[in-house]
A protein has these predicted regions:
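Conserved, structured core segments of small domains
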Residues: 1-112
Length: 112
């Protein structure tokens, strides 16, 4: 089994504000489905109003760092047998959230 990070950029969800309850329910339905399938590890949204903090070479600096056009808006971590399975779950998340999702394999699992 391999873990994957599925994420979207903050600001990529461009649906009308009145659609938010329906989008949230659709996203929660996918999470419930992933939990029932035993593939859900963790997920959540990133609060964009919080300043980031960066730790480098033993020191900590207030951010945000670096200047960037895209910031992660939310993510899911799943554990599935194959890349194709990860892509299938990413497609379900994309459909429910109405925005593109990026899929990345997690190379290091501290539990292994």
């Amino acid at each position: 089994m391999t873990r994957y990070l599925i994420s979207f950029d903050d600001g990529s969800m461009t649906f009308p504000e009145e659609d938010f309850p329906a989008v949230a329910e659709a996203a929660h339905a996918v999470v419930r489905e992933a939990k029932a399938a035993g593939v859900w590890i963790f997920g959540g949204g990133i609060l964009n109003q919080q300043a980031s903090i960066v730790a480098t070479d033993g020191s900590v600096s207030d951010g945000p760092y670096p200047e960037t056009k895209a910031v992660i808006g939310g993510f899911s971590i799943i554990e599935v047998p194959s890349r194709d399975d990860a892509l299938m779950w990413a497609a379900k998340i994309a459909s429910s959230c109405r925005c593109a999702q990026e899929v990345r394999e997690i190379m290091y699992d501290p539990e292994s």
